[in-house]
Protein backbone atom coordinates (compact mmCIF):
# COMPACT_ATOMS: atom_id res chain seq x y z
CA UNK A 1 0.00 0.00 0.00
CA UNK A 2 1.35 3.50 -0.78
CA UNK A 3 2.50 5.74 2.07
CA UNK A 4 -0.68 7.68 2.75
CA UNK A 5 -1.73 9.74 5.76
CA UNK A 6 -3.49 8.22 8.68
CA UNK A 7 -6.24 10.81 8.35
CA UNK A 8 -6.84 9.65 4.79
CA UNK A 9 -7.15 6.01 5.84
CA UNK A 10 -9.53 6.78 8.69
CA UNK A 11 -11.67 9.01 6.51
CA UNK A 12 -11.75 6.40 3.74
CA UNK A 13 -12.84 3.67 6.15
CA UNK A 14 -15.56 5.91 7.52
CA UNK A 15 -16.85 6.58 4.01
CA UNK A 16 -16.69 2.85 3.19
CA UNK A 17 -18.70 1.81 6.25
CA UNK A 18 -21.23 4.59 5.87
CA UNK A 19 -21.94 3.71 2.26
CA UNK A 20 -22.35 0.00 2.99
CA UNK A 21 -24.83 0.74 5.77
CA UNK A 22 -26.86 3.18 3.62
CA UNK A 23 -26.68 1.26 0.34
CA UNK A 24 -26.19 -2.50 1.02
CA UNK A 25 -27.17 -3.38 -2.56
CA UNK A 26 -24.55 -1.20 -4.32
CA UNK A 27 -21.91 -3.90 -4.85
CA UNK A 28 -20.06 -1.86 -7.46
CA UNK A 29 -19.07 0.62 -4.77
CA UNK A 30 -17.61 -2.07 -2.61
CA UNK A 31 -15.20 -3.05 -5.40
CA UNK A 32 -13.20 0.21 -4.87
CA UNK A 33 -10.10 -0.96 -3.02
CA UNK A 34 -8.72 0.60 0.15
CA UNK A 35 -6.02 2.56 -1.62
CA UNK A 36 -8.57 4.27 -3.83
CA UNK A 37 -10.73 5.08 -0.84
CA UNK A 38 -7.72 6.58 0.89
CA UNK A 39 -6.99 8.81 -2.10
CA UNK A 40 -10.58 9.98 -1.97
CA UNK A 41 -10.14 10.75 1.72
CA UNK A 42 -6.95 12.68 1.15
CA UNK A 43 -8.64 14.72 -1.57
CA UNK A 44 -11.47 15.61 0.80
CA UNK A 45 -8.97 16.60 3.50
CA UNK A 46 -7.04 18.80 1.03
CA UNK A 47 -10.15 20.64 -0.16
CA UNK A 48 -11.46 21.06 3.37
CA UNK A 49 -8.11 22.36 4.60
CA UNK A 50 -8.03 25.07 1.93
CA UNK A 51 -11.58 26.15 2.68
CA UNK A 52 -10.82 26.31 6.39
CA UNK A 53 -7.58 28.17 5.67
CA UNK A 54 -9.43 30.86 3.70
CA UNK A 55 -12.04 31.18 6.42
CA UNK A 56 -9.35 31.33 9.06
CA UNK A 57 -7.50 34.04 7.12
CA UNK A 58 -10.67 36.10 6.87
CA UNK A 59 -11.34 35.56 10.57
CA UNK A 60 -7.78 36.58 11.42
CA UNK A 61 -8.16 39.82 9.47
CA UNK A 62 -11.32 40.55 11.37
CA UNK A 63 -10.18 39.37 14.76
CA UNK A 64 -6.61 40.68 14.58
CA UNK A 65 -6.99 44.02 12.81
CA UNK A 66 -4.24 45.51 14.93
CA UNK A 67 -1.68 43.06 13.56
CA UNK A 68 0.58 43.98 10.64
CA UNK A 69 1.53 41.84 7.69
CA UNK A 70 3.74 42.57 4.72
CA UNK A 71 3.09 41.19 1.28
CA UNK A 72 6.05 39.97 -0.69
CA UNK A 73 5.89 41.59 -4.14
CA UNK A 74 8.26 40.44 -6.85
CA UNK A 75 8.65 41.15 -10.53
CA UNK A 76 7.21 44.67 -10.33
CA UNK A 77 9.34 47.71 -11.21
CA UNK A 78 9.02 51.03 -9.40
CA UNK A 79 8.14 54.34 -11.01
CA UNK A 80 11.71 55.49 -10.39
CA UNK A 81 13.07 52.55 -12.38
CA UNK A 82 10.80 53.03 -15.39
CA UNK A 83 10.48 56.83 -15.43
CA UNK A 84 11.64 59.00 -18.31
CA UNK A 85 14.86 61.01 -18.10
CA UNK A 86 15.95 64.42 -19.41
CA UNK A 87 18.79 63.90 -21.89
CA UNK A 88 19.17 67.26 -23.65
CA UNK A 89 18.66 70.94 -22.84
CA UNK A 90 19.21 73.93 -25.10
CA UNK A 91 19.07 77.55 -23.99
CA UNK A 92 18.91 80.49 -26.39
CA UNK A 93 18.90 84.26 -26.07
CA UNK A 94 17.12 86.12 -28.87
CA UNK A 95 16.29 89.80 -29.29
CA UNK A 96 12.96 90.67 -30.86
CA UNK A 97 13.07 94.15 -32.48
CA UNK A 98 10.06 96.46 -32.29
CA UNK A 99 9.12 98.37 -35.43
CA UNK A 100 8.30 101.50 -33.42
CA UNK A 101 9.90 102.49 -30.09
CA UNK A 102 7.30 102.16 -27.35
CA UNK A 103 6.66 104.76 -24.64
CA UNK A 104 4.37 104.53 -21.65
CA UNK A 105 4.11 106.71 -18.56
CA UNK A 106 7.50 105.55 -17.26
CA UNK A 107 9.14 107.07 -20.33
CA UNK A 108 7.21 110.35 -20.21
CA UNK A 109 8.17 110.82 -16.56
CA UNK A 110 11.85 110.23 -17.41
CA UNK A 111 12.23 106.94 -15.53
CA UNK A 112 12.94 104.79 -18.58
CA UNK A 113 14.03 105.07 -22.18
CA UNK A 114 11.67 104.03 -25.00
CA UNK A 115 11.46 100.29 -25.53
CA UNK A 116 13.08 99.17 -28.80
CA UNK A 117 13.45 95.40 -28.36
CA UNK A 118 12.44 92.50 -26.14
CA UNK A 119 14.94 89.92 -24.91
CA UNK A 120 13.59 86.36 -25.21
CA UNK A 121 15.18 83.52 -23.23
CA UNK A 122 14.18 80.14 -24.70
CA UNK A 123 14.49 76.64 -23.24
CA UNK A 124 14.16 73.49 -25.35
CA UNK A 125 14.16 70.15 -23.52
CA UNK A 126 14.15 66.58 -24.85
CA UNK A 127 13.71 63.36 -22.87
CA UNK A 128 15.06 59.83 -23.33
CA UNK A 129 11.60 58.68 -24.44
CA UNK A 130 11.54 61.27 -27.21
CA UNK A 131 9.23 63.88 -25.69
CA UNK A 132 10.03 67.56 -26.16
CA UNK A 133 9.00 70.82 -24.55
CA UNK A 134 9.57 74.51 -25.30
CA UNK A 135 9.33 77.43 -22.90
CA UNK A 136 10.39 81.05 -22.75
CA UNK A 137 10.97 83.99 -20.48
CA UNK A 138 11.58 87.59 -21.48
CA UNK A 139 12.82 90.95 -20.35
CA UNK A 140 12.00 94.43 -21.56
CA UNK A 141 15.05 96.70 -21.55
CA UNK A 142 17.80 95.44 -19.18
CA UNK A 143 17.88 91.93 -17.76
CA UNK A 144 17.88 89.52 -20.67
CA UNK A 145 21.61 88.83 -20.58
CA UNK A 146 21.49 88.21 -16.84
CA UNK A 147 18.53 85.84 -17.03
CA UNK A 148 20.25 83.83 -19.77
CA UNK A 149 23.54 83.71 -17.85
CA UNK A 150 21.90 82.37 -14.69
CA UNK A 151 19.84 79.83 -16.63
CA UNK A 152 23.09 78.63 -18.22
CA UNK A 153 24.66 78.22 -14.77
CA UNK A 154 21.91 75.94 -13.43
CA UNK A 155 20.68 74.07 -16.52
CA UNK A 156 22.97 71.04 -16.17
CA UNK A 157 21.04 70.10 -13.02
CA UNK A 158 18.23 68.94 -15.30
CA UNK A 159 20.16 66.07 -16.89
CA UNK A 160 19.07 62.65 -15.66
CA UNK A 161 15.95 63.94 -13.91
CA UNK A 162 12.49 62.61 -14.66
CA UNK A 163 10.77 65.46 -16.55
CA UNK A 164 7.48 64.56 -14.87
CA UNK A 165 8.90 65.50 -11.46
CA UNK A 166 8.42 69.21 -12.10
CA UNK A 167 8.20 70.31 -8.46
CA UNK A 168 11.31 68.35 -7.51
CA UNK A 169 13.22 69.87 -10.43
CA UNK A 170 12.04 73.37 -9.52
CA UNK A 171 13.34 72.96 -5.98
CA UNK A 172 16.65 71.62 -7.27
CA UNK A 173 17.11 74.63 -9.55
CA UNK A 174 16.25 77.04 -6.75
CA UNK A 175 18.87 75.48 -4.50
CA UNK A 176 21.41 75.52 -7.31
CA UNK A 177 21.10 79.31 -7.34
CA UNK A 178 20.22 79.84 -3.68
CA UNK A 179 22.72 82.68 -3.26
CA UNK A 180 20.76 84.95 -5.59
CA UNK A 181 17.43 84.45 -3.83
CA UNK A 182 13.98 83.30 -4.89
CA UNK A 183 12.63 86.22 -6.88
CA UNK A 184 13.62 88.47 -9.76
CA UNK A 185 16.18 87.14 -12.22
CA UNK A 186 16.79 84.09 -10.02
CA UNK A 187 13.35 82.69 -10.82
CA UNK A 188 13.01 84.32 -14.23
CA UNK A 189 15.94 82.12 -15.26
CA UNK A 190 13.94 79.06 -14.16
CA UNK A 191 10.80 80.23 -15.99
CA UNK A 192 11.64 79.00 -19.51
CA UNK A 193 12.69 75.62 -18.10
CA UNK A 194 9.58 75.22 -15.97
CA UNK A 195 7.31 76.28 -18.83
CA UNK A 196 9.05 73.81 -21.16
CA UNK A 197 8.51 70.98 -18.66
CA UNK A 198 4.79 71.75 -18.43
CA UNK A 199 4.64 71.91 -22.23
CA UNK A 200 6.28 68.47 -22.38
CA UNK A 201 3.95 67.06 -19.73
CA UNK A 202 0.87 68.08 -21.70
CA UNK A 203 2.36 66.83 -24.97
CA UNK A 204 3.06 63.48 -23.32
CA UNK A 205 -0.58 63.33 -22.20
CA UNK A 206 -1.74 64.22 -25.72
CA UNK A 207 -3.64 67.27 -24.45
CA UNK A 208 -3.56 71.06 -24.67
CA UNK A 209 -2.09 72.37 -21.42
CA UNK A 210 -5.44 73.95 -20.48
CA UNK A 211 -7.08 70.51 -20.60
CA UNK A 212 -4.28 68.93 -18.59
CA UNK A 213 -4.80 71.55 -15.88
CA UNK A 214 -8.57 71.02 -15.89
CA UNK A 215 -10.05 73.78 -18.02
CA UNK A 216 -13.14 75.72 -16.93
CA UNK A 217 -13.62 77.07 -20.47
CA UNK A 218 -12.37 76.68 -24.04
CA UNK A 219 -11.88 80.40 -24.67
CA UNK A 220 -11.01 83.53 -22.68
CA UNK A 221 -12.28 87.09 -23.16
CA UNK A 222 -9.43 89.11 -24.61
CA UNK A 223 -8.41 92.78 -24.64
CA UNK A 224 -5.75 94.68 -26.59
CA UNK A 225 -3.07 96.97 -25.15
CA UNK A 226 -0.62 97.62 -27.97
CA UNK A 227 -2.82 100.11 -29.83
CA UNK A 228 -3.15 102.57 -26.96
CA UNK A 229 0.39 103.51 -25.89
CA UNK A 230 1.16 107.09 -24.93
CA UNK A 231 3.58 107.61 -27.82
CA UNK A 232 0.70 106.97 -30.24
CA UNK A 233 -1.20 110.10 -31.41
CA UNK A 234 -4.88 110.11 -30.50
CA UNK A 235 -6.08 109.86 -34.09
CA UNK A 236 -3.98 106.72 -34.56
CA UNK A 237 -5.24 105.33 -31.25
CA UNK A 238 -8.80 105.69 -32.53
CA UNK A 239 -7.85 103.92 -35.78
CA UNK A 240 -6.25 101.12 -33.75
CA UNK A 241 -9.40 100.84 -31.65
CA UNK A 242 -11.55 100.45 -34.76
CA UNK A 243 -9.18 97.87 -36.25
CA UNK A 244 -9.12 95.89 -33.00
CA UNK A 245 -12.89 95.73 -32.86
CA UNK A 246 -13.07 94.62 -36.49
CA UNK A 247 -10.55 91.88 -35.69
CA UNK A 248 -12.78 90.48 -32.95
CA UNK A 249 -11.16 91.89 -29.82
CA UNK A 250 -13.27 91.89 -26.66
CA UNK A 251 -11.83 94.91 -24.84
CA UNK A 252 -9.48 97.89 -25.20
CA UNK A 253 -6.86 99.14 -22.76
CA UNK A 254 -5.63 102.72 -22.92
CA UNK A 255 -2.38 103.91 -21.37
CA UNK A 256 -2.62 106.88 -18.98
CA UNK A 257 -0.28 108.46 -16.43
CA UNK A 258 0.99 111.48 -18.34
CA UNK A 259 2.37 114.44 -16.40
CA UNK A 260 -0.59 116.42 -17.76
CA UNK A 261 -3.55 114.53 -16.27
CA UNK A 262 -6.01 116.60 -18.33
CA UNK A 263 -4.53 115.02 -21.46
CA UNK A 264 -5.29 111.58 -20.01
CA UNK A 265 -8.93 112.55 -19.54
CA UNK A 266 -9.11 114.01 -23.06
CA UNK A 267 -7.80 110.81 -24.67
CA UNK A 268 -9.97 108.62 -22.45
CA UNK A 269 -13.08 110.63 -23.36
CA UNK A 270 -12.39 110.23 -27.08
CA UNK A 271 -11.84 106.47 -26.81
CA UNK A 272 -14.96 105.93 -24.71
CA UNK A 273 -17.05 107.89 -27.23
CA UNK A 274 -15.62 105.80 -30.08
CA UNK A 275 -16.33 102.52 -28.29
CA UNK A 276 -19.75 103.35 -26.93
CA UNK A 277 -20.93 103.22 -23.34
CA UNK A 278 -20.75 99.48 -22.68
CA UNK A 279 -17.77 98.15 -24.64
CA UNK A 280 -15.12 96.91 -22.14
CA UNK A 281 -12.46 99.57 -21.54
CA UNK A 282 -9.50 99.60 -19.14
CA UNK A 283 -6.77 102.14 -18.32
CA UNK A 284 -3.17 101.57 -17.20
CA UNK A 285 -1.07 104.16 -15.34
CA UNK A 286 2.08 102.00 -15.12
CA UNK A 287 2.78 102.94 -11.46
CA UNK A 288 3.17 106.65 -12.16
CA UNK A 289 0.70 108.24 -9.72
CA UNK A 290 1.19 109.01 -6.07
CA UNK A 291 -1.65 108.24 -3.67
CA UNK A 292 -3.25 111.68 -3.91
CA UNK A 293 -3.20 111.73 -7.71
CA UNK A 294 -4.48 108.17 -7.86
CA UNK A 295 -7.56 108.85 -5.74
CA UNK A 296 -8.29 112.10 -7.60
CA UNK A 297 -7.93 110.49 -11.04
CA UNK A 298 -9.77 107.41 -9.90
CA UNK A 299 -12.79 109.50 -8.92
CA UNK A 300 -12.76 111.34 -12.23
CA UNK A 301 -12.62 108.04 -14.10
CA UNK A 302 -15.61 106.55 -12.28
CA UNK A 303 -17.78 108.16 -14.97
CA UNK A 304 -16.18 106.13 -17.78
CA UNK A 305 -17.51 102.71 -16.75
CA UNK A 306 -14.07 101.09 -16.71
CA UNK A 307 -13.38 97.40 -16.21
CA UNK A 308 -10.36 98.39 -14.10
CA UNK A 309 -7.70 100.99 -13.35
CA UNK A 310 -4.33 99.26 -13.64
CA UNK A 311 -1.17 99.95 -11.63
CA UNK A 312 -2.20 103.36 -10.32
CA UNK A 313 0.57 103.20 -7.68
CA UNK A 314 4.02 101.72 -7.16
CA UNK A 315 3.83 97.94 -7.60
CA UNK A 316 4.95 97.29 -4.02
CA UNK A 317 2.60 99.77 -2.33
CA UNK A 318 0.22 97.15 -0.98
CA UNK A 319 -1.34 99.48 1.58
CA UNK A 320 -1.93 102.27 -0.94
CA UNK A 321 -3.57 99.92 -3.43
CA UNK A 322 -5.78 98.51 -0.68
CA UNK A 323 -6.93 102.00 0.34
CA UNK A 324 -7.66 102.88 -3.29
CA UNK A 325 -9.55 99.64 -3.90
CA UNK A 326 -11.71 100.33 -0.87
CA UNK A 327 -12.40 103.95 -1.86
CA UNK A 328 -13.39 103.46 -5.52
CA UNK A 329 -16.22 101.64 -7.24
CA UNK A 330 -13.98 101.01 -10.25
CA UNK A 331 -11.95 97.81 -9.70
CA UNK A 332 -8.19 98.04 -9.19
CA UNK A 333 -5.78 95.75 -11.06
CA UNK A 334 -2.09 95.24 -10.32
CA UNK A 335 0.66 92.64 -9.95
CA UNK A 336 2.39 92.41 -13.34
CA UNK A 337 5.72 93.65 -11.97
CA UNK A 338 5.88 91.24 -9.04
CA UNK A 339 8.42 88.47 -9.40
CA UNK A 340 7.50 85.71 -6.93
CA UNK A 341 4.64 83.88 -5.30
CA UNK A 342 5.40 85.53 -1.94
CA UNK A 343 5.01 89.02 -3.39
CA UNK A 344 1.64 88.10 -4.87
CA UNK A 345 0.66 86.51 -1.59
CA UNK A 346 1.17 89.85 0.17
CA UNK A 347 -0.90 91.59 -2.51
CA UNK A 348 -3.79 89.13 -2.24
CA UNK A 349 -3.85 88.82 1.54
CA UNK A 350 -3.56 92.60 1.80
CA UNK A 351 -6.76 93.11 -0.24
CA UNK A 352 -4.76 95.36 -2.53
CA UNK A 353 -6.65 94.74 -5.77
CA UNK A 354 -9.76 93.32 -7.36
CA UNK A 355 -7.83 91.83 -10.30
CA UNK A 356 -4.50 90.03 -9.90
CA UNK A 357 -2.13 90.25 -12.88
CA UNK A 358 0.64 87.69 -12.47
CA UNK A 359 3.07 87.07 -15.30
CA UNK A 360 4.28 83.44 -15.53
CA UNK A 361 7.70 84.26 -17.03
CA UNK A 362 8.25 86.93 -14.37
CA UNK A 363 7.18 84.94 -11.30
CA UNK A 364 9.26 81.88 -12.16
CA UNK A 365 7.12 79.87 -14.54
CA UNK A 366 3.87 77.97 -14.55
CA UNK A 367 4.49 76.20 -11.23
CA UNK A 368 4.42 79.35 -9.04
CA UNK A 369 1.72 80.86 -11.27
CA UNK A 370 -0.58 77.94 -10.40
CA UNK A 371 -0.01 78.61 -6.69
CA UNK A 372 -0.90 82.27 -7.22
CA UNK A 373 -4.04 81.23 -9.10
CA UNK A 374 -5.08 78.93 -6.28
CA UNK A 375 -4.63 81.60 -3.61
CA UNK A 376 -6.36 84.27 -5.69
CA UNK A 377 -9.35 82.02 -6.36
CA UNK A 378 -9.71 81.21 -2.66
CA UNK A 379 -9.92 84.93 -1.94
CA UNK A 380 -12.33 85.73 -4.77
CA UNK A 381 -9.91 87.74 -6.90
CA UNK A 382 -10.36 88.01 -10.64
CA UNK A 383 -7.47 87.12 -12.94
CA UNK A 384 -5.93 89.10 -15.81
CA UNK A 385 -2.43 87.76 -16.60
CA UNK A 386 0.14 90.13 -18.05
CA UNK A 387 1.67 89.69 -21.54
CA UNK A 388 2.78 86.21 -22.86
CA UNK A 389 -0.67 85.22 -24.13
CA UNK A 390 0.80 82.04 -25.64
CA UNK A 391 1.25 80.70 -22.09
CA UNK A 392 -1.44 82.58 -20.21
CA UNK A 393 -4.30 81.48 -22.45
CA UNK A 394 -4.01 77.97 -21.02
CA UNK A 395 -3.69 79.16 -17.43
CA UNK A 396 -6.59 81.60 -17.69
CA UNK A 397 -8.76 78.87 -19.22
CA UNK A 398 -8.18 76.83 -16.05
CA UNK A 399 -9.17 79.63 -13.63
CA UNK A 400 -12.57 79.17 -11.90
CA UNK A 401 -13.65 82.83 -12.20
CA UNK A 402 -14.08 84.39 -15.65
CA UNK A 403 -10.68 85.99 -16.44
CA UNK A 404 -9.32 88.42 -19.01
CA UNK A 405 -6.39 87.73 -21.36
CA UNK A 406 -4.05 90.43 -22.65
CA UNK A 407 -3.52 90.36 -26.43
CA UNK A 408 -0.01 91.34 -27.51
CA UNK A 409 0.95 90.56 -31.08
CA UNK A 410 4.61 91.36 -30.45
CA UNK A 411 5.65 87.73 -29.97
CA UNK A 412 3.84 86.40 -33.06
CA UNK A 413 7.01 86.21 -35.24
CA UNK A 414 8.62 83.81 -32.75
CA UNK A 415 6.20 80.98 -33.44
CA UNK A 416 4.94 79.00 -36.40
CA UNK A 417 1.42 78.85 -35.00
CA UNK A 418 -0.96 81.70 -34.15
CA UNK A 419 -3.85 81.93 -31.70
CA UNK A 420 -7.44 82.29 -32.85
CA UNK A 421 -9.29 85.48 -31.89
CA UNK A 422 -13.04 85.37 -32.43
CA UNK A 423 -16.15 86.92 -30.86
CA UNK A 424 -14.12 88.89 -28.34
CA UNK A 425 -12.32 85.78 -27.06
CA UNK A 426 -9.06 83.91 -27.54
CA UNK A 427 -9.64 80.21 -28.22
CA UNK A 428 -7.60 77.27 -26.94
CA UNK A 429 -6.46 75.19 -29.92
CA UNK A 430 -6.46 71.39 -30.01
CA UNK A 431 -2.66 71.34 -30.38
CA UNK A 432 -0.90 69.45 -27.61
CA UNK A 433 1.02 71.26 -24.89
CA UNK A 434 1.23 75.02 -25.26
CA UNK A 435 0.59 74.49 -28.95
CA UNK A 436 3.50 76.36 -30.48
CA UNK A 437 6.85 75.63 -32.12
CA UNK A 438 9.74 78.02 -32.70
CA UNK A 439 9.94 79.74 -36.07
CA UNK A 440 12.98 80.19 -38.28
CA UNK A 441 12.76 83.90 -37.51
CA UNK A 442 13.26 83.14 -33.82
CA UNK A 443 16.42 81.22 -34.76
CA UNK A 444 17.67 84.13 -36.86
CA UNK A 445 17.19 86.56 -33.96
CA UNK A 446 19.16 84.31 -31.60
CA UNK A 447 22.47 85.79 -30.47
CA UNK A 448 23.59 83.26 -27.84
CA UNK A 449 22.90 79.57 -27.26
CA UNK A 450 24.27 76.64 -25.28
CA UNK A 451 23.48 72.93 -25.01
CA UNK A 452 23.70 70.32 -22.25
CA UNK A 453 23.60 66.56 -22.72
CA UNK A 454 23.11 64.86 -26.06
CA UNK A 455 20.26 65.29 -28.52
CA UNK A 456 19.17 61.82 -29.63
CA UNK A 457 16.42 62.84 -32.03
Question: Model-flagged regions — what are they?
Answer:
Residues 61-72, 81-89, 96-101, 114-115, ...:
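Flexible C-terminal active-site loop/helix
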Residues 238-247, 297-303:
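Alpha/beta enzyme core
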Residues 221-236, 286:
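Active-site mouth loops of central-metabolism enzymes
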Residues 73, 88-92, 125-204:
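Metal- or metallocofactor-binding catalytic centers and their adjacent structured scaffolds
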Residues 130, 193, 206, 284, ...:
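Conserved, mostly hydrophobic/aromatic
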Residues 2, 6-8, 12-13, 34-35:
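Positively charged N-terminal leader segments that act as targeting/secretion signals
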Residues 254-386:
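Catalytic core of soluble alpha/beta enzymes
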Amino acid sequence: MPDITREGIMLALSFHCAIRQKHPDCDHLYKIDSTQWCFIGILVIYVSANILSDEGHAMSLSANSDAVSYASVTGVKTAAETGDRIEWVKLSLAFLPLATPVSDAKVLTGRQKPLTEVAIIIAEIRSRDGFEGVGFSYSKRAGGQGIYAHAKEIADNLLGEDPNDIDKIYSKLLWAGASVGRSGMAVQAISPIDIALWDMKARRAGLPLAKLLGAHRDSVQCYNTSGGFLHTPLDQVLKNVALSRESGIGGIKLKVGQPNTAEDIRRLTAVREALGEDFPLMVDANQQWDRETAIRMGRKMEAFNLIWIEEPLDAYDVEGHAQLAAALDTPIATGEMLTSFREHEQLILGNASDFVQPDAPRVGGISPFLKIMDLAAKHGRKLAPHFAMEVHLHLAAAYPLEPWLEHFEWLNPLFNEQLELRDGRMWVSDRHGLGFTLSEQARKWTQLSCEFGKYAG
